[in-house]
Amino acid sequence: MGIQSSWFYSSKHQSAKREGMVKEGKGGIVSELIYSNNQYSDNQYSDNQAVINRILLPLLRQSGNEARWLLWVSPHKKLSRQWLINSGLPLDKIIQLNRMSSITTVEAMERALASGNYSVVLGWLPTLSGKDTVRLQAAAQKGNALGFIMRPQDVSKETSRAESRSDLLKIHSIHYH
Protein backbone atom coordinates (compact mmCIF):
# COMPACT_ATOMS: atom_id res chain seq x y z
CA MET A 1 0.00 0.00 0.00
CA GLY A 2 2.93 2.36 0.59
CA ILE A 3 3.04 5.60 2.48
CA GLN A 4 -0.42 6.96 3.14
CA SER A 5 -1.09 10.62 2.45
CA SER A 6 -3.91 11.01 4.94
CA TRP A 7 -4.68 9.66 8.37
CA PHE A 8 -8.36 9.45 7.51
CA TYR A 9 -8.38 5.84 6.43
CA SER A 10 -11.20 3.98 4.75
CA SER A 11 -14.04 2.88 6.98
CA LYS A 12 -13.71 -0.68 5.72
CA HIS A 13 -10.62 -0.98 7.94
CA GLN A 14 -11.68 -1.11 11.56
CA SER A 15 -9.57 0.70 14.09
CA ALA A 16 -7.55 -1.24 16.61
CA LYS A 17 -9.54 0.51 19.31
CA ARG A 18 -12.85 -0.86 18.01
CA GLU A 19 -11.34 -4.31 17.78
CA GLY A 20 -10.44 -4.19 21.44
CA MET A 21 -6.71 -3.99 20.78
CA VAL A 22 -6.28 -0.83 22.85
CA LYS A 23 -7.34 -0.35 26.43
CA GLU A 24 -8.03 3.30 27.10
CA GLY A 25 -6.16 4.98 29.91
CA LYS A 26 -3.64 2.17 30.41
CA GLY A 27 -0.61 4.04 29.19
CA GLY A 28 0.66 6.50 26.70
CA ILE A 29 3.20 9.25 26.95
CA VAL A 30 4.40 12.29 25.08
CA SER A 31 8.10 13.11 25.03
CA GLU A 32 10.47 15.34 23.13
CA LEU A 33 13.40 14.33 20.93
CA ILE A 34 15.94 16.96 19.96
CA TYR A 35 18.25 15.95 17.15
CA SER A 36 21.08 17.58 15.25
CA ASN A 37 19.79 19.54 12.28
CA ASN A 38 23.28 19.34 10.70
CA GLN A 39 22.91 15.59 10.28
CA TYR A 40 19.64 15.85 8.39
CA SER A 41 20.12 15.31 4.67
CA ASP A 42 18.14 17.00 1.92
CA ASN A 43 16.19 13.97 0.77
CA GLN A 44 16.02 11.60 3.69
CA TYR A 45 17.03 11.05 7.27
CA SER A 46 20.78 10.69 7.61
CA ASP A 47 22.42 7.45 8.65
CA ASN A 48 24.53 9.52 11.07
CA GLN A 49 21.49 10.59 13.08
CA ALA A 50 22.13 9.02 16.50
CA VAL A 51 18.82 10.02 18.10
CA ILE A 52 16.86 8.65 15.17
CA ASN A 53 18.90 5.45 14.73
CA ARG A 54 19.54 4.47 18.35
CA ILE A 55 16.37 5.57 20.09
CA LEU A 56 13.54 6.08 17.67
CA LEU A 57 14.04 3.42 14.97
CA PRO A 58 14.07 0.41 17.34
CA LEU A 59 10.88 1.70 18.94
CA LEU A 60 9.25 2.30 15.54
CA ARG A 61 10.24 -1.18 14.33
CA GLN A 62 8.72 -2.75 17.42
CA SER A 63 5.57 -0.64 17.14
CA GLY A 64 5.32 -1.60 13.47
CA ASN A 65 4.48 -5.13 14.62
CA GLU A 66 1.31 -3.90 16.31
CA ALA A 67 -2.06 -3.72 14.58
CA ARG A 68 -1.95 0.08 14.73
CA TRP A 69 -0.45 2.77 12.48
CA LEU A 70 2.67 4.93 12.77
CA LEU A 71 1.86 8.59 12.04
CA TRP A 72 4.33 11.30 10.99
CA VAL A 73 2.78 14.78 11.29
CA SER A 74 4.42 17.68 9.40
CA PRO A 75 7.96 16.41 9.10
CA HIS A 76 10.26 18.89 7.40
CA LYS A 77 10.94 16.48 4.58
CA LYS A 78 8.89 13.92 2.72
CA LEU A 79 9.67 10.46 4.00
CA SER A 80 11.86 8.54 1.61
CA ARG A 81 10.42 5.17 0.67
CA GLN A 82 13.97 3.80 0.37
CA TRP A 83 14.90 5.13 3.83
CA LEU A 84 11.82 3.45 5.31
CA ILE A 85 12.72 0.15 3.64
CA ASN A 86 16.39 0.39 4.70
CA SER A 87 15.28 1.21 8.26
CA GLY A 88 13.10 -1.88 8.47
CA LEU A 89 9.86 0.04 8.91
CA PRO A 90 6.61 -1.39 7.55
CA LEU A 91 5.52 0.66 4.52
CA ASP A 92 1.95 -0.49 4.91
CA LYS A 93 1.65 1.01 8.41
CA ILE A 94 3.20 4.44 7.83
CA ILE A 95 1.00 7.49 7.38
CA GLN A 96 2.41 10.96 6.75
CA LEU A 97 0.65 14.34 6.96
CA ASN A 98 2.47 17.32 5.46
CA ARG A 99 2.26 21.08 5.19
CA MET A 100 0.24 21.84 8.27
CA SER A 101 0.50 24.94 10.45
CA SER A 102 1.76 24.37 14.00
CA ILE A 103 -1.71 24.99 15.46
CA THR A 104 -3.26 22.43 13.12
CA THR A 105 -0.38 20.05 13.81
CA VAL A 106 -1.04 20.13 17.57
CA GLU A 107 -4.72 19.43 16.97
CA ALA A 108 -3.94 16.62 14.50
CA MET A 109 -1.50 15.06 16.97
CA GLU A 110 -4.05 15.31 19.77
CA ARG A 111 -6.79 13.65 17.72
CA ALA A 112 -4.46 10.92 16.47
CA LEU A 113 -3.06 10.14 19.92
CA ALA A 114 -6.53 9.93 21.47
CA SER A 115 -8.01 7.80 18.67
CA GLY A 116 -6.26 4.58 19.61
CA ASN A 117 -5.51 3.97 15.92
CA TYR A 118 -1.82 4.88 16.21
CA SER A 119 0.86 3.26 18.33
CA VAL A 120 3.31 6.13 17.67
CA VAL A 121 2.67 9.71 16.55
CA LEU A 122 5.64 11.90 15.63
CA GLY A 123 5.10 15.63 15.22
CA TRP A 124 7.47 18.42 14.24
CA LEU A 125 6.34 21.30 16.43
CA PRO A 126 7.72 24.53 17.85
CA THR A 127 7.94 24.94 21.61
CA LEU A 128 4.52 24.12 23.04
CA SER A 129 2.54 25.93 25.69
CA GLY A 130 1.88 24.11 28.93
CA LYS A 131 -1.76 23.78 27.92
CA ASP A 132 -0.86 22.08 24.63
CA THR A 133 1.54 19.72 26.39
CA VAL A 134 -1.17 18.70 28.87
CA ARG A 135 -3.66 18.16 26.01
CA LEU A 136 -1.21 15.92 24.13
CA GLN A 137 -0.34 13.94 27.26
CA ALA A 138 -4.02 13.34 28.08
CA ALA A 139 -4.68 12.26 24.48
CA ALA A 140 -1.72 9.84 24.54
CA GLN A 141 -2.99 8.26 27.75
CA LYS A 142 -6.51 7.95 26.37
CA GLY A 143 -5.31 6.24 23.18
CA ASN A 144 -2.49 4.29 24.83
CA ALA A 145 -0.08 5.83 22.31
CA LEU A 146 3.44 7.20 22.26
CA GLY A 147 3.86 10.76 21.04
CA PHE A 148 7.17 12.30 20.08
CA ILE A 149 7.67 15.99 19.54
CA MET A 150 10.61 16.20 17.17
CA ARG A 151 12.84 19.26 17.34
CA PRO A 152 15.75 19.78 14.97
CA GLN A 153 18.65 21.71 16.42
CA ASP A 154 21.45 23.37 14.48
CA VAL A 155 24.50 22.10 16.35
CA SER A 156 26.84 24.76 15.00
CA LYS A 157 24.70 27.50 16.57
CA GLU A 158 23.97 25.63 19.76
CA THR A 159 27.33 24.10 20.69
CA SER A 160 28.24 26.62 23.36
CA ARG A 161 24.77 26.57 24.90
CA ALA A 162 24.58 22.77 24.67
CA GLU A 163 27.70 22.33 26.78
CA SER A 164 25.95 24.00 29.69
CA ARG A 165 22.56 22.35 29.13
CA SER A 166 21.64 18.86 30.19
CA ASP A 167 18.11 18.91 28.78
CA LEU A 168 18.81 18.21 25.11
CA LEU A 169 17.10 14.84 25.29
CA LYS A 170 14.14 14.49 27.59
CA ILE A 171 13.32 10.93 28.51
CA HIS A 172 10.35 10.54 30.78
CA SER A 173 10.38 7.53 33.05
CA ILE A 174 8.71 6.43 36.25
CA HIS A 175 11.85 4.46 37.08
CA TYR A 176 14.82 6.28 38.57
CA HIS A 177 18.22 4.67 38.99
Swiss-Prot record:
Lon protease binding: annotated segments: 170-177
Keyword tags: Cell cycle, Cell division, DNA damage, Septation, SOS response
Residue ranges, annotated region (FtsZ binding): 112-118
Domain of life from the UniProt record: Bacteria
GO BP annotation list: division septum assembly; DNA repair; negative regulation of cell division; SOS response
Induction per the UniProt record: By DNA damage, as part of the SOS response.
Cleavable signal peptide: none
Post-translational modification: Is rapidly cleaved and degraded by the Lon protease once DNA damage is repaired.
InterPro entries in alphabetical order: Cell_div_suppressor_SulA, P-loop_NTPase, SulA_CellDiv_inhibitor, SulA_enterobact
Coiled coil: none
Site (described: Essential for degradation by Lon protease): 177
Function as written in the Swiss-Prot or TrEMBL entry: Component of the SOS system and an inhibitor of cell division. Accumulation of SulA causes rapid cessation of cell division and the appearance of long, non-septate filaments. In the presence of GTP, binds a polymerization-competent form of FtsZ in a 1:1 ratio, thus inhibiting FtsZ polymerization and therefore preventing it from participating in the assembly of the Z ring. This mechanism prevents the premature segregation of damaged DNA to daughter cells during cell division.
Oligomer status and interactors: Interacts with FtsZ.
Family as reported in the entry's similarity comment: Belongs to the SulA family.
Protein name as it appears in the record: Cell division inhibitor SulA
Taxonomic placement: Bacteria, Pseudomonadati, Pseudomonadota, Gammaproteobacteria, Enterobacterales
Name of the gene: sulA
